[in-house]
């Protein structure tokens, strides 16, 4: 009878350790996924900052805007410059 109780308690302890390890692995996986999402967003923001400003994007001079756009003097955003060429 004592051995059955010992085996049952040992089994429960082993199950608790396995579940705890599984939960830790799940938390680590979740942290990695969230970290990857945050890194992707910061990379996207940096890429946008390196490129030219699109239509109605904030600017301080014409060189900030993309091709066929110019910086509006009053509102400081990129607007169409009136050209059609490629």
Swiss-Prot record:
It comes from the Eukaryota. The keyword 4Fe-4S does not apply. The keyword Transmembrane does not apply. Transmembrane segments: none annotated. GO terms for cellular component: extracellular region. Residues 1-21 form the signal peptide. GO terms for molecular function: ion channel inhibitor activity; toxin activity. Disulfide bonds join 52-66, 59-71, 65-78. It is found in: Secreted. Keywords: Disulfide bond, Ion channel impairing toxin, Knottin, Secreted, Signal, Toxin. Its main location: secreted. Pfam families: Toxin_12. Expressed by the venom gland. Residues 22-50 form a propeptide. Ion channel inhibitor. Belongs to the neurotoxin 10 (Hwtx-1) family. 17 (Hntx-9) subfamily. The presence of a 'disulfide through disulfide knot' structurally defines this protein as a knottin. This is Omega-theraphotoxin-Hhn1d.
